[in-house]
């Protein structure tokens, strides 16, 4: 946890930073490692996960998970400028980048100098982070290690627990002594893939396919369910069509991110949860017993059943499971109302590998 300080540039500064980033990016893209995926053109988190799975399934199923403590706030300016100076020889560009690094931030309406770190919120910060951590990539490649890195989130995959512990010690030492960064030893650990959470994904071993596969991590699922409950809250005073619109945004975004994982059964469960909660929202929207009975009959529920349900006084949660209500507010009718199904989205092809 904790609060990150954002250095939000002015419009002019943002324009200048973007211009510099556009010049520097193609130069450094030629130097960056193939297994670096964060903040790079035509690369994404899903590609990092697919590469990690390939490595795990080659027998490298001991994971070194190194956590960099407040990386963006602790980058050493002199070390970073030295690294940049090896490639960029234009003094004006070097000067502008350094001025950007020391531009400072506002905290509680008071200016504070930036002695270390790259101000988050600017166009240059992600590129500078990759320039610094490319030194780590080169060191890991020199040691012959299997790794993937997404910005400051890096995992290394080796074949044994003994090797993993040795790599943890050696790479942590390199990060702290050579790069001047801080490793959070409390959060860093050696583990099997089943104990790993990486970029929101969890991992498991498929006994039938005899290989590791990815899935949404339990914490990612919990976060999704929390947001889904907020969007289907009965006391939220907006129309049900608006709720469906916001739900669809959540469903599409979450499913498109995690669709490379094994999630068919999970999608079926989550689709059911959403339909259940929407039925409660619709029941509340109908308000009076008379109106509820009338709407149920419009949806082909027999008159006797419609009035029994409308006047029974059961709680919303119980009524949403009622067979007649499920037959009235069917999956097909919710779909025609505009609700998107997770299950229908997961069959879209996986991202292209770089």
Language model features with spans:
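Short acidic (Asp/Glu) and glycine-rich catalytic loops that position anionic groups and cofactors
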Residues: 1, 28-32, 60-62, 76-78, ...
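Short, residue-level hotspots on alpha-helical faces of the histone-fold
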Residues: 14, 18, 22, 26, ...
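Short, solvent-exposed helix-loop connector elements
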Residues: 5, 113-116, 229-242, 253-266, ...
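A conserved non-catalytic segment of reverse transcriptases
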Residues: 102, 178-246, 250-252
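Conserved nucleotidyltransferase catalytic core and NTase-mimicking acidic/glycine-rich helix/loop elements
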Residues: 259-311
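Conserved polymerase palm-domain catalytic core
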Residues: 31-43, 47-197
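Duplex nucleic acid-engaging cores and interfaces of nucleic-acid transaction enzymes
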Residues: 7, 11-21, 45, 49, ...
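Conserved small/polar residues in nucleotide/adenosyl-binding loops
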Residues: 346-352
